[in-house]
A protein has these predicted regions:
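Winged-helix-like regulatory helical subdomains adjacent to P-loop NTPase cores
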Residues: 1-37, 84-85
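Mixed-charge (Asp/Glu-Lys/Arg
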Residues: 63, 76-236
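Short, hydrophobic/amphipathic alpha-helical patches that form generic packing surfaces
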Residues: 16-19, 69-76, 118
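Short amphipathic alpha-helical interaction segments
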Residues: 33-50
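Short capping/hinge segments at domain boundaries that bridge a core fold to an adjacent linker or tail
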Residues: 49-85
Length: 236
């Protein structure tokens, strides 16, 4: 899919940016720090036009996992050592695939709440657009969970960092108006008052429950939002 990219205007810069995105550069600032800011906007726009990368807020992600894997293993290795032989390339690629598979298996063996905690622990001041809202994901010092009073209520999450407190309700069961109301009550017990209240569910929310959450100024993260974040932070 990258064939001919380097021959286009700003294509060389675009290819450099793409390689660094594949190797963990998530934000425009981070990409610029690695390759310089000259003609960076045009290079990144070319990646969007060629459907090689997508932008969300200040973050960039290669949505095709095969392309991302190829760039970070085969392509990067060939560029650093043009004389490397095919068996070595194949071995490195296979080891990378096995490592990704192991990571995926370990992640899916964890509870949904633990996966969300791991996600929060990776935030580092990136700006993203989720649920028709743009917001910054602070770097948190601590992320802890708390069990609600009822067994069916999922898990509450409290994240602290940069003088901010975020609270989230992490749900695997269907969310209704009462679930939102109990979470709002929990948030009112927090000191300092949470600067963000988030409803996180691995199933689509009922429209009425979503309206109630938005009326309480809560950020709603549904499955598509979580998939985007997991991809952005290399968990899918």
């Amino acid at each position: 899919r990258t064939e001919g990219l380097a021959r286009e205007r700003a294509g060389g810069r675009a290819l450099e940016a793409l390689v660094h995105i594949a190797n963990g550069a998530r934000t425009t600032t981070e990409i610029g720090n690695r390759i310089g800011r000259a003609a960076l906007s045009a290079a990144l726009q070319l990646l969007v036009e060629r459907d090689l990368a997508t932008r969300n807020g200040t973050c960039w992600v290669i949505t095709d996992p095969i392309l991302r894997c190829w760039l970070s293993t085969i392509f990067t290795t060939q560029r650093s050592d043009p004389h490397v032989n095919s068996p070595t390339l194949r071995d490195r690629f296979e080891r990378h695939i096995r490592a990704l598979w192991t990571q995926w298996m370990q992640a899916n063996a964890r509870s949904f709440a633990d996966q969300v905690v791991g996600l929060f622990q990776q935030f580092s001041d990136e700006t993203v657009s989720l649920d028709s809202k743009t917001g910054r994901l602070p770097k948190f010092d601590t992320v802890r969970t708390q069990s609600p009073n009822t067994a069916v209520e999922g898990t509450y999450l409290v994240a602290l960092g940069q003088g901010k407190r975020w609270c989230a309700t992490v749900q695997e069961q269907p969310i209704d108006e009462q679930t939102i109301a109990r979470f709002e009550t929990f948030c009112r017990t927090q000191a300092p008052k949470p600067s963000r209240k988030i409803v996180i569910s691995n199933a689509p929310l009922d429209q009425h429950a979503k309206l109630v959450a938005k009326a309480a100024n809560m950020w709603v993260w549904e499955p598509n939002d979580l998939h985007l974040l997991m991809g952005l932070y290399g968990q899918v």
